[in-house]
Amino acid sequence: MIINAKGPASFAEKYIVRSIWENKFPPGSILPAERELSELIGVTRTTLREVLQRLARDGWLKIQHGKPTRVNNFWETSGLNILETIADLNPEGFPVLVDQLLSARTNVSAIYFRGALRNSPDTAVEVLGQIHQLEDTAESFAEYDYLLHHTLAFSSGNPLYVLILNGFKGLYSRVGRYYFSSPEARQLALNFYKELEILAKAKNYIDVPALMRTYGINSGKMWLQLRDDMPSSIAQQDGNA
């Protein structure tokens, strides 16, 4: 098992998570005793204990006082916060993960975009007004796109959508910088922003779902043209597009 880590705690965490992912510690199984596991990984018991607590908070493990530590089925117990970890564990499946991420984001964003234009049209107009000073670079578009989604999610009347976005912020930011490296993708997005601004100024939230659906289809086609050339480094938390 080859693991790149910045320190003992990071190494221990990645070792345990990868062992769970590769079914060496399958769901429902009991982890080795603390002393045995610390010797196996090569870290102190204090470091291991801290790592186990962190993994339990993320849903990978179940820790109960006086009982052995049990491995959870993370698909049932974890949240969006492990997306980064899954991307790191399964780089070969990363393009499919991104497909699923973008599909989920498109479906959810149609709800909070409509809600924002209905409940806070002035806020929508204000944030959309920034497109007229937007630099034609991948970084600027990726940053603005996230800002737009974050602002409209918060203004939709249901701030829980913001927490959903926060769950895959790092992953989406890296993918976004790659996606918006395409001039065609930037132009497609800019056209969408302009049409959305028109709806916001007219306080027309009724037509938002149709606009979102059209943009979702077109941006999906654009993504399919770009995904096969996506650098594998994007899957890593410190990867650069």
From Swiss-Prot:
Transmembrane segments: none annotated. Gene3D superfamilies: GntR ligand-binding domain-like, Winged helix-like DNA-binding domain superfamily/Winged helix DNA-binding domain. Residues 6-74 form the HTH gntR-type domain. HAMAP family: HTH_FadR. Residues 34-53 bind DNA. GO terms for cellular component: cytoplasm. This is Fatty acid metabolism regulator protein. Its main location: cytoplasm. InterPro entries: FA-response_TF_FadR (IPR014178), FadR_C (IPR028374), TF_FadR/GntR_C (IPR008920), Tscrpt_reg_HTH_GntR (IPR000524), WH-like_DNA-bd_sf (IPR036388), WH_DNA-bd_sf (IPR036390). Homodimer. Multifunctional regulator of fatty acid metabolism. It is found in: Cytoplasm. One of its GO terms (biological process) is fatty acid metabolic process. PROSITE patterns: HTH_GNTR (PS50949). GO terms for molecular function: DNA binding; DNA-binding transcription factor activity; fatty-acyl-CoA binding. Keywords: Activator, Cytoplasm, DNA-binding, Fatty acid metabolism, Lipid metabolism, Repressor, Transcription, Transcription regulation.
